Amino acid sequence: LGTRPLRTAKATDTWVLAGPAEEVLEPSLTLHGFRYAEVRGVPDLRAEDIELVVVGTDLRRTGWFSSSHALLDQLHENVVWSTRGNFVDLPTDCPQRDERLGWTGDTQIFGPTATFLYDTTGLLCSWLTDLAAEQLPDGAVPHVIPDVNRNSLSSTPAAAWGDAATIVPWTLYQRTGDLEVLERQLPSMRAWVDRIATLAGPDRLWIGGFQYGDWLDPTAPPEDPFGAKVDPDVVATAHLARSSWILAESARLLGHDDEAEKYRILNQEVRAAFAHAFVTPAGRVLSDAQTVYALAIAWDLLPHEHQRQAAGRRLADLVRAAGFRIATGFVGTPLVCDALTATGQLDVAYRLLLQTQCPSWLYPVTMGATTIWERWDSMRPDGSINPGEMTSFNHYALGAVADWLHRTVAGLAPAAPGYRALVVRPQPTAELTRAAARHLSPYGEASVAWERADGRLHLTVHVPVGATAEVYVPGSPAPERVGHGEHRWDVPDPCAAQVLAGSSIPN
């Protein structure tokens, strides 16, 4: 068994038999995350004598995805299993080693995916209550909630991790339409933004201090998970911009106009400072890495359209130069495909998604993974385990790309909080013949399915009662607005030219 990644966790149950009578071992005060187990001391033990019991919070399944690509479907299934294995009373980072903690960064990164797949509202609202309770008087957010570490490092403000205070409530509002989530969390959100704005000072740049940065990007050495290519100051200032925008919007929605204006101005100042300090007039971003372009594009940190388009082209060039291999860590991974899509680089996004060589989303699948790994190479191509300390085999953060599968590959996304309005915008590729997603929204089941066959694209959309949808049919000049019910389109296959040209996804 590969137990080294467990670190100090023994992950061992010892049972002393009382006598010859039949006994059942089922520990009730612990749980173990594992794929393989070893049993000793039981003669004539058969596989059928052992029953594996899945432990997790009993969350209602609300989201599904499928496609014609077997590896892609297995990736999505791995995301589902990592969600099940880590949402146990609270959103943990991993279920097996000597942590099993509610890491804030992991939770906010994975939030959009988790809230599509399962009804996590109750669990995450409870966790946010704990976050607010654990928040320090100065507004700093501990790195794990509940804060079992309680040391000076764990309460040092860290970008992306502490920003769970703003991003998770905003994600829940977007998925449920429930303003009470924002109302309850607004003091916590405000305290966090005020704290990091103070750290940034009058120049509005969050510089220095402790940062995780783009945690565990592929260039980080096994012994140095902090060793990402991206300048942590870029990551930190980008998150100050994001959180101040969320706070301003939340205050506006709740009718706190003066507060909304205050944080709107802060957001404008941070965005201007980011552009001045980190972006060239031609659209190059400091560190010149996939993650910084993903952040700048996805979070609207580039003041001019020509910079945005140049950044998209540069991001695509970096992906090509890497052989269509991923080069992002925890921070950039949820955003990189969106950034490529938003700047007209959909073909590059698909080639990145469907890459099977290491590092990539599908590489672990080719190695037999059944959950999402903490590192892109938790297992090396030769079958050896990465020697680094951070080598979990069930860690959902890098699976955040599933949100892009739902919204872009299948094409199902909320256009208004709580799915009161849907945007259906499937973006097919020649590499897939079909894709589908469905979600149990507050209004009922919404679904999208498309299939390419015989030179045609067949699109089926189901809109629940009480909701509407804006449908972007591939090849059509304008979207169509539809009400509840099932709607079908049969149009020319937009990928037919790619197929005739012999399109493929090379490694």
Walk through the language-model features, giving the residues of each.
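Alpha-helical support elements that line or immediately flank enzyme active sites
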Residues: 26-29, 40, 105-135, 166-182, ...
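Non-catalytic C-terminal accessory modules of carbohydrate-active enzymes
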Residues: 264-265, 347-507
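The feature captures the catalytic groove of carbohydrate-active enzymes
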Residues: 4, 10-13, 19, 92-94, ...
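Extended, well-ordered alpha-helical scaffold segments
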Residues: 75-78, 120-131, 179-197, 250-275, ...
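Extracellular/oxidizing-compartment recognition motifs
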Residues: 1-97, 105-106, 122-125, 138, ...
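Repeat-solenoid scaffold signature
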Residues: 321-367
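Surface-exposed acidic, glycine/proline-enriched linker/cap segments
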Residues: 76, 80, 219-229, 376-391
